[in-house]
Amino acid sequence: MVQLNQDFINSIAKDMPAHLTMDDFISYSSKPLRPSIRINTLKISSDEFVTLMAAKGWTLDPIPWCSDGFWVALDNEIQLGNTIEHIQGLFYIQEASSMLPPTALFDGLDNSSEYTILDMASAPGSKTTQMASLMDNKGLLVANEYSSSRVKVLHANVQRMGVYNTALTHFDARVFGEYLYHQFDAILLDAPCSGEGTIRKDPLALRNWSLEENASIIETQKALIESAFLALKTGGSLVYSTCALSRSENQEVCEHLMSCFPQAVEFQSLSELFPDADKSCTSEGFLHVWPQIYDSEGFFIAKVRKVADVERQKPLPKAQRNFPFTAANNKTKDELSHYFKHTFGISLPKDGLIMERDLEYWLFPAKMADFIGKMRFQRIGLKLADGLKKGFKVRHEAIMALSDKHNAIELNESQAIEYLMGRDIPLQDGGKPQGEVILTYHHCALGVAKHLGKRLKNNLPRELVRDKVISAKAKTEL
């Protein structure tokens, strides 16, 4: 049984609802989490994926608050992160409770594909990619992460999942209320917290828990929610969430926001967000998810609507200069579009901006035009290709995000594993060399190869070559 910090037990007992018991809390906290995944509908439908994986011995049990989320029961032990399907971005390994904040934010958000949305604390990217999927890669999703090392992880997951409506930033999120005041239609603040709800995933999560340590976290949470509210447009929605369980990191932070802007804050009830949501709903309409309620991690979710204008707290910052990208001219855009269509059968999205930097060609979200000069961005949109003396060289991430099920060579499982391990694929009766071709598995993109007639020359970027790739239906390593 998990060893819980006694100070934590004493503290949390005061916050536990009367209808729940500490014995049940400790019992569920001692159980391993049920594995759960979210299907990436930017690449494959949930129905297609369920059918596909059922044939491989997977049993997928729907998560009631996320239409694309499933608990997974497997016929044998499989390292999900090493499967072909995970590497090619067909699913994200995501704890079930963490799917709740995006679901709450997008509930009632019509035409979300046209919105500008902020994810204030994004890494490693589970909620960012979930929101991008809900937006169908449209609109603009600004994804911020304070930790430089975690920005890299965020970017890797955005790429793997084929997301291209994002602009990544690397700031202390307290600056958003100043730099991007009144800019966002909706905001998710999944705030840094004590992690009290993650004990089932990490038995040592509460080893150093203390009220003193939490006090500084709470001050940060209050500053972040103020910043988020200032960055939100009037009429917009803000979801505040944590994986903490205490009132001090949850309800009291929301009450702090109400005290700061009493005329502008309206709490929205989440009691009908999904069947049985009322089991975790507080009197304010927040969801306070304890592990024993849904057999999940602990989580807290509150939804706030901004019902009145709030004055800017600080002067408008100076515009950022020296933006390194320029809009591509019509000739370049036509040549790039022809290259993608003629070589790969891909039509570039018409609602994006084709931008260039030196000999790099990028696809930016159209709404990015409104943000240039307002803040420094780490990475925007999707890198399409590099320029050559004659023509272009496609980027792997462009194929992973834009390719469809046509104009490709379908690999079998053993060939797909070989490709992801950086090896060339021999061909029998390969015919004449065809140049650059898209490779697929399950008719979803794996990457690009050069068809040389008798073999497919592997063009997988070196940093993406894997030492270990496994079948989703067996533990056999090839």
From Swiss-Prot:
<dbReference type="InterPro" id="IPR049560">
    <property type="entry name" value="MeTrfase_RsmB-F_NOP2_cat"/>
</dbReference>
<keyword id="KW-0949">S-adenosyl-L-methionine</keyword>
<keyword id="KW-0698">rRNA processing</keyword>
<dbReference type="Pfam" id="PF01189">
    <property type="entry name" value="Methyltr_RsmB-F"/>
</dbReference>
<dbReference type="InterPro" id="IPR001678">
    <property type="entry name" value="MeTrfase_RsmB-F_NOP2_dom"/>
</dbReference>
<dbReference type="GO" id="GO:0003723">
    <property type="term" value="F:RNA binding"/>
</dbReference>
<dbReference type="InterPro" id="IPR029063">
    <property type="entry name" value="SAM-dependent_MTases_sf"/>
</dbReference>
<protein>
    <recommendedName>
        <fullName>Ribosomal RNA small subunit methyltransferase F</fullName>
        <ecNumber>2.1.1.178</ecNumber>
    </recommendedName>
</protein>
<dbReference type="InterPro" id="IPR048457">
    <property type="entry name" value="YebU_pre-PUA_dom"/>
</dbReference>
<comment type="function">
    <text>Specifically methylates the cytosine at position 1407 (m5C1407) of 16S rRNA.</text>
</comment>
<feature type="binding site">
    <location>
        <position position="145"/>
    </location>
    <ligand>
        <name>S-adenosyl-L-methionine</name>
    </ligand>
</feature>
<dbReference type="InterPro" id="IPR023545">
    <property type="entry name" value="rRNA_ssu_MeTfrase_F"/>
</dbReference>
<feature type="binding site">
    <location>
        <begin position="121"/>
        <end position="127"/>
    </location>
    <ligand>
        <name>S-adenosyl-L-methionine</name>
    </ligand>
</feature>
<dbReference type="InterPro" id="IPR031341">
    <property type="entry name" value="Methyltr_RsmF_N"/>
</dbReference>
<dbReference type="GO" id="GO:0009383">
    <property type="term" value="F:rRNA (cytosine-C5-)-methyltransferase activity"/>
</dbReference>
<dbReference type="Pfam" id="PF17125">
    <property type="entry name" value="Methyltr_RsmF_N"/>
</dbReference>
<dbReference type="InterPro" id="IPR018314">
    <property type="entry name" value="RsmB/NOL1/NOP2-like_CS"/>
</dbReference>
<dbReference type="InterPro" id="IPR023267">
    <property type="entry name" value="RCMT"/>
</dbReference>
<feature type="active site" description="Nucleophile">
    <location>
        <position position="243"/>
    </location>
</feature>
<keyword id="KW-0489">Methyltransferase</keyword>
<keyword id="KW-0694">RNA-binding</keyword>
<feature type="binding site">
    <location>
        <position position="172"/>
    </location>
    <ligand>
        <name>S-adenosyl-L-methionine</name>
    </ligand>
</feature>
<keyword id="KW-0808">Transferase</keyword>
<dbReference type="Pfam" id="PF21150">
    <property type="entry name" value="YebU_pre-PUA_dom"/>
</dbReference>
<dbReference type="InterPro" id="IPR027391">
    <property type="entry name" value="Nol1_Nop2_Fmu_2"/>
</dbReference>
<feature type="binding site">
    <location>
        <position position="190"/>
    </location>
    <ligand>
        <name>S-adenosyl-L-methionine</name>
    </ligand>
</feature>
<comment type="similarity">
    <text>Belongs to the class I-like SAM-binding methyltransferase superfamily. RsmB/NOP family.</text>
</comment>
<dbReference type="Pfam" id="PF13636">
    <property type="entry name" value="Methyltranf_PUA"/>
</dbReference>
<dbReference type="InterPro" id="IPR011023">
    <property type="entry name" value="Nop2p"/>
</dbReference>
<keyword id="KW-0963">Cytoplasm</keyword>
<dbReference type="GO" id="GO:0005737">
    <property type="term" value="C:cytoplasm"/>
</dbReference>
<dbReference type="GO" id="GO:0070475">
    <property type="term" value="P:rRNA base methylation"/>
</dbReference>
